[in-house]
Amino acid sequence: MPAIKFLSPFLIFIFFTINVSSDTKIGFGSCLDQRYPQKIWKSIADENINKFIFLGDNVYGDVPSGDTKKLVKAYKLQARRFPRWLNELEKLAIWDDHDYGKNDGGSEYKHKRLTQKIFMDFWDIPSNDPRRNREGTYFSKDYIIEKNKIKVIGLDTRYFRSNLLGSRTNRQPNNDLNSSILEISQWSWLENELNDPKTEIFIIKKIEVWLRLLDFVV
């Protein structure tokens, strides 16, 4: 089993070391607001991580109107916040609502194609990556560490999510059998990834821990 270490968070921050290799350490973090100092990076640097996975809300640049100047500006400021050593690591990223472009946003957000392109450009996603030619930012990445195959999966719980019911302070269950969080294509993709017989360890980023899954038929 991985050894898990919790550090002072952005909002949620996890470190763990995979026991198959004493040299492999992957950092996780989310909810990183570019408007404020980020002293947490000093503590992270002391951990000598090899890779970093951004779990969402990697910037705060909500643009419900579709004017993306605010979002682009947020990314530019975030880039200046990142320490130099972080730029030398491999980074994986998935978004949540504040880098998606709309607070609590889901499939109804009209500008999601545009904000997805901005997301892809910021994280230097290659032109031949499937995410450049499909809807949603979900991904998988395989690693071989001391003959163990490890699969990292990031799920997009914004792009396809059915509308929330009720008010922000009084959400209501969604009993519509046609409602979804991932949508059929992402579910099928996920099933295929999880059925990989050669993978011994899965690391999955999914929906926020405080969202009540029973509010959806998934």
Report each predicted region and the residues it spans.
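Bacterial N-terminal signal peptides that target proteins for export
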Residues: 1-8
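Cleavable N-terminal signal peptides
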Residues: 9-10, 19-21
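N-terminal signal peptide c-region/cleavage motif recognized by signal peptidases
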Residues: 15-17
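Metal-dependent phosphoester/phosphodiester hydrolase catalytic core
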Residues: 20-218
